[in-house]
């Protein structure tokens, strides 16, 4: 993360861009909460370094602090959109699709569609934060480069163990991306879950290195119990809710009552779904919201005679774009705890980002998704 920030530059706007690129990249692969917690201390150190400068106006430092904190929160949420493992709603979508239609969404299939959306939202949110929401008078901040170098020096050279974990991480990502068009030729039954398990277990087998040679494992059970297993329980609960909705007939009953939507065009229905999920997740868990809505949207697609992907993907993406309130997402709560932001700041800046994300998701899902995933949005093949 620090390397990415140092490479992008010391201009105030570039520092914020560096934080957003680093945060979003990390969020593609690890929990957005962990990413925000990791990036926050670095951001606070940069803001404090700027406040110590005699040339820095107090108001300018406050503006920079707010913008940097929001950039961390926004990019942590946006980065998760890019990959299937980036955020729990994406996994719930894949799981429910497998449960209801026995259709697999591979890592690569989601990545091809999710990454461009993530990049587009990062660019737009950076321009919005640095040129519209906040206006910086102080353009240069060379001391920021010094602080970043200090943080890098504290870390020291990359260790053997870090190299091992990085290698496993790269191999995992490459295996996920190449599975559908390369690895399945040699191992037809290989799927993304097996790849994840193999690479995860390998960390328990590979050993660390010290002056006396190899001794401990890279990971042990004490490390494993500290992992956020609650997310997996929530994920399992979401699939159980989906099955309950289907088997009880509740999903079909709700879908039947949505027949009034039949008179509207698909793009209007999409806009309603995206906006509803977007603002609903401001006050509720995005995982719970998606687990509740996706089993309803599947039969609703049959009633409306549209492809279920179009409604389900739209809802899934919009669940990751709640930028207004501290309770909306864990990254929002993390940066709010830094005391650089007020709720009014988050609402003022976040509401326009919500609206921007609604428009971007609407355009991408309606026009691009059917092309990338090769389906007819006005035809339901699962009837």
Regions found by a protein language model. Name each.
Residues 33-48, 69, 82-99, 143, ...:
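Re-entrant/interfacial helical elements at transmembrane boundaries that shape
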Residues 4-8, 61-64, 71, 147-157, ...:
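Membrane-interface segments at loop-to-transmembrane junctions
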Residues 99-102, 109-256, 274, 352-358, ...:
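Hydrophobic transmembrane alpha-helices of multi-pass small-molecule transporters
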Residues 36, 118, 191-200, 256-269, ...:
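Structural signature of hydrophobic alpha-helical transmembrane segments
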Residues 12-25, 52-79, 105-113, 266-279, ...:
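Alpha-helical transmembrane segments of multi-pass membrane proteins
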Residues 1-56, 230-304:
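Membrane-embedded alpha-helical segments and adjacent helix-loop junctions characteristic
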């Amino acid at each position: 993360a620090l390397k990415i920030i140092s490479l992008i530059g010391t201009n105030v706007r570039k520092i914020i861009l560096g934080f957003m690129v680093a945060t979003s990249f990390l969020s593609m692969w690890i929990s957005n909460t962990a990413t925000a917690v990791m990036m926050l201390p670095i951001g606070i150190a940069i803001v404090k370094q700027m406040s110590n400068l005699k040339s820095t106006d107090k108001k300018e430092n406050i503006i920079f602090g707010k913008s940097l904190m929001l950039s961390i929160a926004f990019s942590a949420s946006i980065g998760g959109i890019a990959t299937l493992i980036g955020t729990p709603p994406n996994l719930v979508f894949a799981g429910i699709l497998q449960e209801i239609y026995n259709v697999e969404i591979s890592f690569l299939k989601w990545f091809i569609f999710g990454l461009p959306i993530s990049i587009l939202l990062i660019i737009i949110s950076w321009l919005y934060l640095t040129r519209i929401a906040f206006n910086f008078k102080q353009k240069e901040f060379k001391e920021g480069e010094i602080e970043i170098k200090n943080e890098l020096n504290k870390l020291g050279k990359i260790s053997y163990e870090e190299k091992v974990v990085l290698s496993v991480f790269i191999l995992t990502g490459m295996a996920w991306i190449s599975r559908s068009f390369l690895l399945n030729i040699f191992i037809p039954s290989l799927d993304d879950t097996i790849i994840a398990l193999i690479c995860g277990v390998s960390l328990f087998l590979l050993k660390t290195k010290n002056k006396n040679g190899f001794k401990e494992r890279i990971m042990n059970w004490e490390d494993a119990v500290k992992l956020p297993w609650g997310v997996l329980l929530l994920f399992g609960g979401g699939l159980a809710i989906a099955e309950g909705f289907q088997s009880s007939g509740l999903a079909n009953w709700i879908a039947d009552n949505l027949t009034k939507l039949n008179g509207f065009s698909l793009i209007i229905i999409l806009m309603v779904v995206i906006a509803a999920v977007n603002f609903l997740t401001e006050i509720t868990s995005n995982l719970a919201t998606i687990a509740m809505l996706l089993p309803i949207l599947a039969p609703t697609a049959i009633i409306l005679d549209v492809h279920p992907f179009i409604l389900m993907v739209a809802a899934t993406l919009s669940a990751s774009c709640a930028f207004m309130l501290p309770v909306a997402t864990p990254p929002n709560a993390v940066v709010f705890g830094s005391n650089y932001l007020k709720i009014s700041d988050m609402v003022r800046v976040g509401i326009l980002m919500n609206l921007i994300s609604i428009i971007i998701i609407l355009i991408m899902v309606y026009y691009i998704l059917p092309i990338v995933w090769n389906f007819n949005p006005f035809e339901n093949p699962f009837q």
